[in-house]
A protein has these predicted regions:
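Short, acidic, Ser/Thr-enriched surface-loop or helix-capping motifs
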Residues: 52
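Short acidic, Pro/Gly- and aromatic-enriched capping/linker segments at domain boundaries
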Residues: 34-49
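N-terminal acidic leader/helix
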Residues: 1-20, 24
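Short alpha-helical "recognition helix" segments of helix-turn-helix
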Residues: 28-29
Length: 58
């Protein structure tokens, strides 16, 4: 699936999907066929890390 390329827009998109549709990042990545490591690195590049307890990037 195509996901936003811009990191700031990607952050909003992923957090919304996590909040509304997925129990965790692993399920989101499997369902959307997204490389979890690449996604995590891209969002880390703008200062956001995944918090599994809150199921969101912060």
């Amino acid at each position: 699936m195509n996901i936003p390329n811009d990191p700031a827009i990607l952050l909003s998109y992923i957090n919304t999907k996590l909040r509304d549709d997925f129990p965790d990042l692993t399920e989101l990545c499997k369902t959307l066929d997204v490389d979890q490591e690449a996604l995590t690195k891209k969002l880390a590049s703008i200062g956001y890390d995944y918090n599994k307890d809150l199921n969101r990037f912060m």
